[in-house]
Regions:
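Register position in tetratricopeptide repeats
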Residues: 60, 88-92, 110, 144, ...
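Helix-start (N-cap) detector for alpha-helical repeat units in TPR-like alpha-solenoids
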Residues: 48, 98, 132-133, 166-167, ...
Length: 229
């Protein structure tokens, strides 16, 4: 998500009005809690244009706390903007060069050039080992290849680096389901819904997992009403 030059100029003018006249002062203002709260209020209560700009601004200053709050709201349009902005912060967390390499790997994977994608992601991870999205994208490629154990390991690493990564929780849940680990699959999908509670595909996947777990426990003689861990 990119901010228009005109909008950035307006923000700089506002920063100047509140006394941030140096470049350092402007940047400090943009990353301040005051600015983030202001943009959050615009995101949840502004008109369509204001919401779009606010989402871009929150992505620009990497305001994950505000965006993680916004994706839980009841307003679908606000959630959609917040989710896009949040994922932008994750994809760009390691810098422009890393983002380009990540996009290249994703393009290769989309064309089913999976080994090429893995090779690119291996290099990226070696260079940027704390880049959570690189691990997550490699997990996705492993999943597409049916290499579920390796995908789970990469999802786990993603979550060490970014505990809020709902995509990693979702992916790990699906992989564990493929491995027959139904209880663990349910747990992972619940964790994803804690972060992204309105996501319908995850809700549907969890319902199916819980049905399978219910049948499994009934078959094994476990009380159907027992708590699903």
């Amino acid at each position: 998500m990119k901010l228009s030059v005109r909008y950035v100029f307006r923000l700089v003018l506002i920063a100047a009005v509140v006394g941030c006249t140096t470049q350092f002062g402007v940047q400090k203002f943009f990353h301040s809690s005051i600015f983030k709260r202001w943009m959050y209020e615009r995101l949840i209560s502004g008109n369509e244009k204001q919401q779009l700009r606010a989402a871009g601004a929150l992505a620009y200053v990497r305001a994950e706390e505000q965006l993680l709050t916004a994706i839980k709201l009841d307003a679908p349009a606000t959630r959609k903007l917040a989710k896009k902005a949040l994922e932008f912060t994750w994809f760009t967390a390691a810098g422009e060069d890393a983002e380009k390499q990540l996009n290249g790997a994703m393009e290769a994977a989309s064309q089913e050039r999976y080994q090429e994608a893995i090779d690119m992601l291996n290099k990226l991870i070696a260079r940027k080992p704390t880049f959570a999205e690189a691990w997550n994208q490699r997990a996705s490629v492993y999943w597409k290849l049916g290499r579920h154990e390796e995908s789970i390991l990469d999802c786990e690493r993603t979550l060490v680096l970014n505990p809020h990564h709902y995509g990693a929780w979702q992916g790990m849940g699906i992989c564990r389901l493929h491995l027959g680990e139904i209880s663990e699959a349910c747990r992972c999908l619940r964790e994803a819904l804690k972060v992204l509670p309105h996501d319908e595909p995850t809700q549907e996947a969890l319902e199916k997992c819980e049905e399978l777990l219910h049948k499994e426990r009934s078959r094994d003689g476990v009380e159907p009403t027992s708590q699903i861990i």
